[in-house]
């Protein structure tokens, strides 16, 4: 069996990567909350280069509270005082995930990763994002760079 660790392992440094390595993982997805140079490892390093990051998980069914009911595949939006809308999606049962109001975008930057992940959640048409990724551009619209540009954030060579 080949073990791959996703972002929920919260691999933020070389020590946590070494722990994954010692437990038989062949690849890890570096936490979006990590600075790009923080994880040194022999494992295959993956970065999420596009996607609205989960901000919070809650056992309270937010969707039911907002929509006055809950069904399969249901979702809702939370709006903050600035007018930003945060998608809320049901995970399983009545557990909810609140996602960032804008996606993290690194599609036009050199991440130094061995593999890159496009993390789709609420996109109606993922094709523009895929095209932007393949041509090393940032897609249209609002986005964040997260922690990535705080450390490095070099433009990709074309």
Question: Residue ranges of each PLM-predicted region?
Answer:
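Active-site pocket-lining/capping segments in soluble small-molecule metabolic enzymes
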Residues: 1-158
């Amino acid at each position: 069996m080949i073990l791959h660790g996703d972002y929920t392992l919260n691999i933020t440094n070389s020590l946590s990567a070494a722990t994954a390595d010692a437990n038989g993982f062949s690849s890890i997805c570096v936490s979006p909350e990590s600075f790009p140079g923080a994880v040194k490892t022999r494992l295959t390093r993956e970065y999420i280069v596009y996607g609205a990051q989960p901000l919070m998980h809650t056992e309270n069914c937010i969707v039911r509270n907002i929509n006055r009911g809950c069904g399969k595949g249901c979702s809702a939006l939370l709006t903050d005082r600035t007018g930003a809308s945060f998608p809320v999606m049901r995970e399983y049962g009545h557990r909810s995930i609140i996602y960032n109001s804008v996606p993290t975008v690194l599609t036009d930057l050199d991440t130094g990763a061995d593999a890159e992940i496009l993390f789709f959640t609420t996109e109606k048409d993922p094709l523009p994002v895929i095209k932007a990724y393949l041509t090393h551009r940032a897609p249209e619209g609002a986005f964040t760079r997260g922690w990535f540009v705080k450390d490095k954030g070099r433009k990709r060579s074309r």
